[in-house]
Amino acid sequence: MVAALLPFGYPTAMTTALEARNIVKQYPGVLAVDGASFSVREGICFGLLGPNGAGKTTTVEIIEGVTKATSGEVYYYGEIAADKFRQEAGVQFQNTALQDYITVRETIEMFRSLYERQADFDEIVEQCSLGDLLDRDNRKLSGGQRQRLLLAVALVNRPRLIFLDEPTTGLDPQARRNFWDLVQNIRAGGSTILLTTHYMDEAQVLCDEIAIMDAGKIIAQGSPDELLQKQYDGLIIELPISDLTDDLSGIEHTLYENLGIIEVVTTDVSESLKRLAPHVSNLNQIKIRQPNLEDLFLDLTGHSLRT
């Protein structure tokens, strides 16, 4: 099923599908994108992470050709992105206006008609789990159903490269997870995906590689595991600041403060707990966990991923 939608074969691990080089976007009084550079290997799901206002949507719109860069270049398989790129890219915009009084079926057919190379209608419907909704008006769709329709619209031209801009914003937890399943199926078929998100859990589930963006700059790029291993050596012990009986300045560990929580990074949990115990009023509030992308973003930028 997926292979019929994505007829380009399986990717080679080292092929670069997309590259952004020194992208700059200057608005009057605002530098929205400040020399952003990153590359996306063929066949992976690549996540561009950042809080609202980081510049990630502007960067992606420049790559898509929706917004013109002040300077910088976008390359698609080693060539300046041009007609071939536009024919082979599928875009699910964060905010796409759909006509209210036409059906799901009519919407898919309308967008298919815009392309010479068209995906099979039935395969798109099956891929996006829209079979029971074909005769429903767009205005009657739930948030999750609407996002599945927008994904179907992004697949109508059998894209080799798919852009998903904040695709699960506003969805309930179950709808988000259902959408993740759809994205993973598309990724398994060999397509390259560029995903923007400010959800840490979404990036950890879906992305093979990520770039972290803040204040218009790319500040880190790599696989989630690589970046976490580079930043952290050990586990994190969490305890509420309100449970401290005195300060921890004498404790020789890496300490972070985040939303009323002290986080201690340590390679020796037992020893750290032994040192912390005399300073804590309620030991039952202590938690031990693995570092995650939210921690990484906070440490690199000084603020939360969802700020």
What is the meaning of each model-derived region?
Residues 233-307:
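Short, charged/small-residue-rich alpha-helical element at the C-terminal edge
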Residues 17-18, 25-195, 200-214, 220:
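ABC transporter nucleotide-binding domains
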Residues 2-24, 303-307:
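ABC-family P-loop ATPase nucleotide-binding domain
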Residues 77, 90, 116, 229-233, ...:
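A generic structural signal for secondary-structure junctions
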Residues 181-267:
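ABC transporter nucleotide-binding domain
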Residues 108, 122-125, 177, 228, ...:
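Generic structural signal for individual residues within well-ordered alpha-helical segments
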